[in-house]
Amino acid sequence: MKGSLSEHKAGNRRFTLYLPPSYSTDSGGFPAVYVQDGSSLFQNQIELLESAFQQQRLPELVLIGIEPENRLDEYTPWPAASLSDRFTDFGGMGYHYLSDITNQFIPLIEENWNVTREPQSRGMIGASLGGLISMFAILKYPSMFGKIGSISGSYWYENAAETIHISSLKPGTARVFMSIGSEEGREKQSIQRHMLKKTKQVHQSLKEKGFTEDQLCLSIEKGAVHHHKYFCKQFINALEWLYGKNRSTL
């Protein structure tokens, strides 16, 4: 690793900070990517990430991995019953979480580290429920985020796809990367069996709202299931599509 990883706390919220190799406080601000579920998507991807920097496939990025206090509450937009006796109900505190991140957490990051404050360079990425709430970030705060990565987003969540469909979201200059495995949800008996279908519905809704091929990507990975190793692989793909100079439809 040529950059650095460090643990921090802002208020009650813990986060992992990745600073790229050329980071300094003297140069212009670096694009900042706010990542759900702490460093789980990138802690084992740093070598690949820095290779992309070195090969100029990506500009150097600052990654901020935000630890959730309770992901079943903070990554869901409204309450819903649990799908299993093994888990508690979904708390539906997602809008409160997004407000806290947008109005409290991000300003603290921008005051203390050399990251650009330009919305078009500010990104948010997550996987599973983290991918769902990342998409809702652009619905709630469209002028705040210019890059959204929704990896295997939980669009099976009750009324999530429908809410996105009827929303007043307009594309503006934002770019949105979505991914899903072709086998996700296939063995589920609950509403999670609709993972692939609901993801395609959301993608179609965004196209109907005016998102062009240059602004919207849906990557369907053949044979992939809903698993962390596929999330991590798509994380690098998401960054390269959202921020890379040689973006293409995957």
From Swiss-Prot:
Pfam families: Esterase
Cross-referenced InterPro entries: AB_hydrolase_fold, Esterase-like, Mycobacterial_A85_antigen
Stimuli inducing this protein: Induced by Btr in iron-limited conditions.
Superkingdom of the organism of origin: Bacteria
Protein name per UniProt: Uncharacterized protein YbbA
Taxon lineage: Bacteria, Bacillati, Bacillota, Bacilli, Bacillales
